[in-house]
Amino acid sequence: MTNLSSDEKLKKATGVVCKQGLFPFPVSETAIRIVKHVVAEEAELDMICAFKDVPSQTMDQLKESSGFSEETIEKLTTSLAKTGLIFNQPSSTGVMVYRLLPLVMIGLMEYKFMTKLTGSNEERELAELFEKLLMELRDEVQSNYTALEPLFASAPQADRTVPARQTDDGKNINIIKVD
């Protein structure tokens, strides 16, 4: 991907991310802004694009699909795992498997906001982008519901989360409003 501009790489990588998960969706300006918000360097975009054809890969597969060295793959996947874009976990046989996650529905959004939040401008901006993306996806689903109905019928049941006001040790949870 060396002959692509940074913006073209960003759009291509966002397209790969948008194809992940149970419900792939089209690339939007909002999705591009979210990926731009969390990706630290251009090489991470190249790593994301290595998952274009196969969303879960071993180190050997990633070496082939990305063209990166093992050391570079370790560095990039660790960085992307910290942002919530890659899930890296050993398989039952002990082989490390790297999986590209979607933006939403158990992906970047959930991992990004599962940790302790500071209320920083960066967190607020990202939360606003995710809120906008969810509204766009809602509108997309509503306008194409009949075509998407078979996907919903075959999808596993969604987990339900009941928000708590206190932690297990009795401390109040600070809820940061986006308004």
Label every PLM stretch briefly:
Residues 1-33:
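Long, low-complexity, charged/polar intrinsically disordered regions in eukaryotic proteins
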Residues 37-45:
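Short helix-coil-helix linker/hinge
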Residues 48-49:
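Hydrophobic residues on short alpha-helical segments
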Residues 53-66:
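Short acidic, hydrophobic short linear motifs in intrinsically disordered regions
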Residues 66-82:
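Short amphipathic alpha-helical interaction segments
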Residues 81-92:
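A short, conserved structural fragment
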Residues 93-138:
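Short, amphipathic alpha-helical interaction segments positioned at domain boundaries
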Residues 127-179:
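Long, Pro/Ser/Thr-rich low-complexity/intrinsically disordered regulatory tracts in eukaryotic proteins
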